[in-house]
């Protein structure tokens, strides 16, 4: 029985990967921005790349204490440029990331979902999460999408505040 469950789960993940591979193809602009955050420290906001995936996985594990889902890692290996925004420091080290994906059940809607936003601890409370979300919104603003959605727990004030500051409307579902 366990084997059948695992097989069915893998089939669902493959369906998600296939759907996202098609939907994300050439969906965003190639935009790079640089922001001064202190003396000699310049942060670069840019599209993700597969070469940064290991750094993103490690930062995610540090922040959320759980790894990224393996099927997401597989998807981002091929569609990092379309589905990931990152912030790197002067040494090309990832200090923040914004991960996106599409829901197959919403195939008829043009909505991309923000899955995770992570900012390294020493850079938190400096507005980088807000700037990263705003940067991501600009990259996807090509007229193809009807919207970007995000989820945050109602008691997660920090997440709700950064979402609101970056232009998201807060609704309770």
PLM feature segments, named:
Residues 123, 127-135:
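Conserved acetyl-CoA pyrophosphate-binding loop and the N-cap/start of the following alpha-helix
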Residues 45, 60, 85, 98, ...:
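Polar/charged side chains located within well-ordered beta-strands of beta-rich proteins
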Residues 61-90, 94-119:
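A conserved beta-strand-loop-helix scaffold within acyl/acetyltransferase catalytic domains
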